[in-house]
Design a protein with these regions (language model features):
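Structured, hydrophobic secondary-structure cores that serve as assembly/anchoring elements
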Residues: 1-14, 88-117
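Oligomerization/assembly interface segments of phage tail-like spikes and tubes
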Residues: 1-2, 21-22, 223
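Alpha-helical scaffold segments that mediate packing/assembly in large oligomeric complexes
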Residues: 6-89
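Sequence/fold signature of self-assembling virion shell proteins
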Residues: 55-89, 110-223
Length: 223
């Protein structure tokens, strides 16, 4: 526990530093989750797999297929969604590289088996692993591979709609309290993405943190 006694008597001489690091990591995870939820809930185009019309009508026959991805790509084309994303790279995140002729799709790690087992309309393997095309393009962090017009990025902490699908009957799918879990795929057509790091940009600090030790008091004058 984070107490004055633990700071004074714990065998870990760097306990305060470790505590601050874990608090920062937790704050970042909360921020990332909130951003994911906001992006998913405000998507301009929403498509459900199979014949479902919302989360609650998804059943065990509605597992993601190549046809679902093809129909999603057509919907995005009809809505004029671009196929060009810019990533910002470099030590100080100032270099830009364009990812052409594709859309970036973010998925949870739970969807990896579904993607790698996917076949196209001719019963041929649809999934192309990233190492097959990495030499000819810029690979994104966490990129797993490609299917059709989509390049899939695995996000280990991707949000899910736990227990918001139909009834789970076979036990072969993720579920919560007997109801199927729904795993969203977030597709991005353009705009820039970067990583948030602790390094300065050379001109200013990115942020400041203030930690109050257990024996220090908060107040309106000292928030």
């Amino acid at each position: 526990s984070y107490t004055a006694d633990s700071l004074n008597f714990d065998t870990d001489a760097d306990l305060l530093m470790h505590t601050n690091r874990e608090l920062m990591n937790a704050a970042m995870k909360i921020t990332e989750d909130a951003l994911q939820i906001d992006l998913i809930n405000n998507a301009g185009v929403v498509r459900y797999t199979g014949n479902a019309t919302n989360n609650y009508t998804l059943n065990e026959n509605d597992e993601l297929t190549y046809r679902d991805l093809m129909q999603l790509s057509i919907d995005l084309d009809n809505n004029r969604c671009p196929k060009q994303t810019t990533i910002i790279t470099g030590t100080r995140l100032t270099d830009t590289k364009v990812i052409p002729a594709c859309r970036v799709a973010y998925i949870g790690s739970e969807l990896i088996p579904t993607l790698e087992a996917m076949v196209d309309l001719h019963d041929a393997k649809a999934f192309i692993p990233v190492e097959m095309y990495a030499a000819g393009t810029t690979v994104l962090t966490g990129e797993r591979g490609r299917v059709g017009d989509f390049r899939f990025i695995v996000v280990p902490d991707m949000v899910r709609f736990a227990g918001e699908g139909g009834a789970s009957t076979s036990g072969a799918f993720y579920d919560t309290n007997g109801m199927l879990d729904v795993f969203p795929i977030l597709v991005v057509g353009e705009e820039s993405f970067t990583t948030i790091g602790f390094n300065t940009d050379g001109k200013s600090s990115k942020f400041k943190t203030k930690n109050m030790k257990p024996d220090e008091l908060y107040s309106l004058d000292n928030p």
